[in-house]
A protein has these predicted regions:
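Hydrophobic pocket-lining residues within nucleotide cofactor-binding pockets
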Residues: 82, 109-111, 174, 203, ...
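Residue-level signal for mature regions of secreted extracellular proteins and peptides
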Residues: 29, 33-36, 248, 265, ...
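Cys/His-rich metal-chelating microdomains
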Residues: 35, 39, 46, 258, ...
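Conserved alpha-helical substructure of the radical SAM core
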Residues: 2-126
Length: 353
């Protein structure tokens, strides 16, 4: 499967996604549970130990036929913590049996080593692991107060994934509990265990992140972090800097709106999950404005729905090109969280700001 890159190191990255697939093929994210066994300070979805789950029978009956119909070749299983879904193994196998690639985003606390060994026989499966520091005092605290046993288990499980060549990326949110040198160590660790990249996301104003912005790195620390980790990048290892300060005044990277759809546990399909998360905050937007339909209630044609969505919804092309010649729309979700118009500039990373 050829990757369609969203992240471009020559641009100021606006989008939280690193890559998708080339059309007419599609990639989606499937929220198979709202439950999570942790309580992270920055969780977009505000997940906890209660919530709904997507059943194996619903996926088989409603979701899978529409994935095939819409040429979906890659599914990211997410949550909550997707491994909290008791049918995670069967769901994964169902997708693999229909030649749909699977990526699992996990906190790595619930990994079953025997299952990982079995999955290593497949070529189209990998894991992305969240890791926000190298110490109990950083990662453990940021992730809701982990026990020493759980903290050690996370690293053991990362090593297991690396051993079986199933570790694709490490996802990290720079935060005040961890030092810059700690993130240098994290990148070196990821490279040593066989990850292809470390993706650094800022602590964004969605979900619990609204209330924990004081934990975010300052712009100066973000710049220093980037400077100290750039040397770790190599031909087979990438550090992905999402929405870092644009001190180089680079043009804003593209927005792949509609190229990675998100299916919530209740079957709702979002044109972008972050727009829905942002609209759940204290602003003038309605989360329903960014829902295209429901896969449990209708037989959706994604191409048709996307065309209708762009035509009938609140998007327009009023961006002031005469003053923003080196800019693009940037991230809609960030603008929603800031209470801006969708046609406004993404001022956080605009090269002219």
């Amino acid at each position: 499967m050829m990757i369609n890159r969203i992240y471009d190191s020559t641009c100021a990255s606006a989008c939280f996604f690193r890559s998708t697939v080339h059309p007419p093929k599609r990639k989606i994210m499937l929220q198979i549970t709202q439950k999570c066994n942790l309580h992270c300070a920055h969780c977009f979805a505000e997940s906890g130990n209660i919530g709904n789950e997507m059943s194996l029978s619903d996926i088989r009956q409603f979701i899978l036929p529409q994935l095939i119909k819409n040429q979906v070749v890659k599914v990211t299983l997410t949550g909550g913590e997707p491994l909290c879904n008791p049918s995670i193994k069967q769901i994964t196998q169902l997708l693999l049996d229909h030649e749909i690639g699977v990526s699992i985003c996990t906190n790595a606390t619930l990994i079953d080593p025997l299952w990982i060994e079995q999955l290593s026989q497949h070529k189209n499966i990998h894991f992305n692991v969240s890791l926000d520091g190298m110490r109990m005092e950083s990662h453990g605290r940021f992730r809701g107060g982990l026990s020493e046993e759980t903290f050690k288990k996370i690293f053991q499980n990362i090593l297991i994934l690396g051993k079986h060549k199933l570790l694709n990326g490490i996802l990290t949110t720079p935060n005040q509990y961890a030092t810059i040198d700690e993130y240098v160590d994290l990148c070196n660790f990821a490279k040593e265990v066989g990850a292809n990249y470390v993706l650094m996301n800022p602590l964004s104003p969605f979900g619990r992140g609204v209330e924990t912005q004081t934990l975010a790195y300052s712009n100066a620390k973000m710049c220093a972090l980037k400077e100290k980790t750039k040397s770790i990048i190599s031909s087979d290892f990438e550090v992905v800097y999402i929405r870092f300060p644009n001190i180089e005044h680079n043009p804003i990277g593209r927005c792949p709106l509609g190229s990675i759809l998100y299916v919530f546990c209740n079957g709702d399909v979002a044109i972008c999950p972050y727009m829905v998360f942002a609209a759940n905050g204290n602003n003038s937007y309605n989360p329903r404005d960014f829902i295209m339909g429901n896969m449990f209630k209708e037989n959706m044609d994604f191409t048709t729905e996307l065309k209708k969505f762009h035509k009938n919804k609140i998007f327009n092309s009023n961006i002031k090109q005469e003053t923003c010649l080196h800019c693009s729309r940037g991230c809609y979700a960030i603008k929603i969280s800031r209470g801006q118009e969708l046609s406004d500039c993404d001022f956080d990373i605009c090269p002219l700001s």
